[in-house]
Amino acid sequence: LACPLCKTRAMWENSPGEINLMFVRNAWYVAAWETEIGETPLARTILNEPVVMYRTADGVAALEDRCCHRALPLSMGKVVGDNLQCGYHGLQFDESGQCVKVPGQSKIPPGAEVRSYPVLQKYGWVWIWTGDPAKAEPDQIPDWWWLDSPEWRTIPGRGGTPMHLNANYLLVSDNLFDISHLTYVHATSIGADSIVDFPVKTERWEEEKRVKMSRVIYDRPAAPFYQKAGKFAGNVDRWIMTTSDLPCYMASDAGSVEVGTGVTPGEVGPERGVEMKIMNLPTPETETST
């Protein structure tokens, strides 16, 4: 079986003449839930790079998690105003990574700085950019309008805490993009033997670097989850659609309606059936963890 993601990923260049098949750096990644970042520094490894995040008066800052003085992780320090203070000798760094205070001396040594990362807050997540800062355009994050819509109720996964996996993020993406496994892995919830007879459709948009897998099932018994949620009297029409936006954004849309009432993803209200959208955003930690 060919993976439609692989061909498209190979075309994503980090910079002219460079193609990194392991990590795409010129892209936004979810670094944390907004609620995870408070008064204490938060350490994360993002694309093999140790990062520390902390909250400022204006938002969130992200710095290299290493003091330029003696290399102690800055996450072992504390937040002082809008600065991050190293826990070893008290050097303070502002959100740009520049050292702004050295205890015991008034002059800041040349080169006393650490790397800072572009960050933004959107859809309840903190996003980080580990590539060329000049290319960090906010509109590169897809428009997932339903996450801000009052007509949709958003339920944070795992209560708003990340899931750590000892697997490469491409394997995680492959699993999330594979809608053929539902019958067997999720037989007691959203899987059903009857769906395997309906074809899976693949669509690709090269310019947008987007791939979509979808399967529409007509006039079949409702899967256990949908039957419980929708209390359908008879068979249903249902759909399973997963859209992958590079580097690793996975947006799924799935639902069931009464037979013949119309499969219209994004437009199914509770009076017609059951619809849910599931966001999975696997962020690479290392080559072997996500």
Place the predicted regions along the sequence by residue.
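Short Pro/Gly-enriched beta-strand edge/turn motifs at strand-loop
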Residues: 24-33, 96-104, 183-186, 260-265
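Short edge beta-strand segments in beta-sheet-rich domains
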Residues: 26, 114-116, 277
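C-terminal catalytic domain of Rieske-type non-heme iron oxygenases
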Residues: 137-290
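Detector for Asparagine
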Residues: 14, 20, 26, 48, ...
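Rieske [2Fe-2S] iron-sulfur-binding domain
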Residues: 4-13, 17-20, 30-152
